[in-house]
């Protein structure tokens, strides 16, 4: 049986692969994206797992042994149970607050502003403060200059759904990296969020991999600055 198209990874750079998958919220097909990074020891660090399928499992296993399964915020955890069951030796990593929200979910360690020694040689991380209902962490893969963004901002330059296009245009988030109105409303302490973004702008970002939308291959630092210049 041929491999389904969305089960095959795309290589963006050395040690950086992404898996795209269908994902809908409120009738809007936002799509989802999982990023798989190969760490210096050869193990895999999996960001925001998409829906589990045997085909995706096989494709991930072909890249290396899974060491970490990462929920980057309080929303992107729905597929962790299936992936953690498939890879019981992998450590499940999540932000503070997810244990209380999903007590049945196995969580082995909580994220903070200090990268784990296993990924610190190649990966920086930062807690976006001022958004307690989201508790999102940004991650920056230094070797490839790749920033991983979950729900903080979308990046859609094309969409098949007219409803999604209309939604994004109404949110001033069409054909640019930008937060939606919902994300803006979730910023309860804008000064704290602004300070977090300013710290992220110190990273030498070229590529931005969003979980919803298309990968931004170039000009990531300027796009990030422009997305939050209103703050």
Q: What are the functions of these language-model segments?
A:
Residues 22-26, 44-50, 68-72, 123-129, ...:
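Short, flexible loop segments at the rims of nucleotide/cofactor-binding pockets, characterized by
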Residues 1-41:
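Zn-dependent metallo-beta-lactamase
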Residues 12-16, 40-44, 117-124, 143-146:
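Beta-strand-turn-beta hairpins that frame and shape the catalytic cleft
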Residues 47-48, 67-74, 93-95, 148-151, ...:
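Active-site neighborhood of phospho(di)ester-bond hydrolases with catalytic His/Asp-centered motifs
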Residues 24-68:
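Pre-active-site segment of Zn-dependent metallo-hydrolases
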Residues 58-118:
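Active-site HxH/HxHxD metal-binding segment of metal-dependent hydrolases
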Residues 2-4, 8-10, 24, 45-46, ...:
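Metallo-beta-lactamase
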Residues 109-134, 191-193:
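Active-site glycine-rich loop that binds ribose-phosphate moieties when present
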């Amino acid at each position: 049986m041929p491999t389904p198209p969305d089960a095959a990874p795309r290589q963006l750079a050395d040690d950086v692969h992404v898996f795209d998958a269908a994902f809908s919220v409120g009738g809007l097909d936002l799509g989802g994206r999982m990023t798989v990074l190969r760490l210096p020891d050869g193990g895999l660090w999996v960001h925001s797992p998409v829906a589990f399928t045997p085909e995706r499992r096989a494709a991930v296993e072909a890249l290396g042994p899974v060491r970490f399964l990462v929920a980057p915020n309080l929303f992107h955890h729905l597929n962790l149970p299936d992936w953690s069951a498939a890879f019981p030796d992998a450590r499940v990593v999540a932000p503070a607050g997810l244990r209380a929200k999903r007590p049945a979910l196995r969580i082995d360690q909580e994220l903070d502003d200090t990268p784990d020694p296993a990924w610190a040689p190649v990966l920086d991380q930062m807690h976006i403060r001022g958004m307690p209902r989201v508790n999102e962490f940004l991650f920056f893969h230094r070797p490839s200059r790749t920033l991983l963004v979950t729900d903080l901002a979308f990046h859609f330059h094309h969409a098949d759904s007219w409803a999604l296009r209309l939604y994004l245009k109404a949110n001033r988030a069409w054909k640019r990296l930008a937060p939606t109105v919902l994300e803006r409303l979730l910023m309860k302490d804008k000064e704290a969020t602004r300070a977090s973004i300013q710290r992220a702008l110190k990273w030498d970002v070229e590529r931005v991999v969003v979980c919803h939308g298309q990968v931004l291959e170039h000009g990531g630092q300027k796009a990030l600055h422009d997305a939050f210049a209103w703050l």
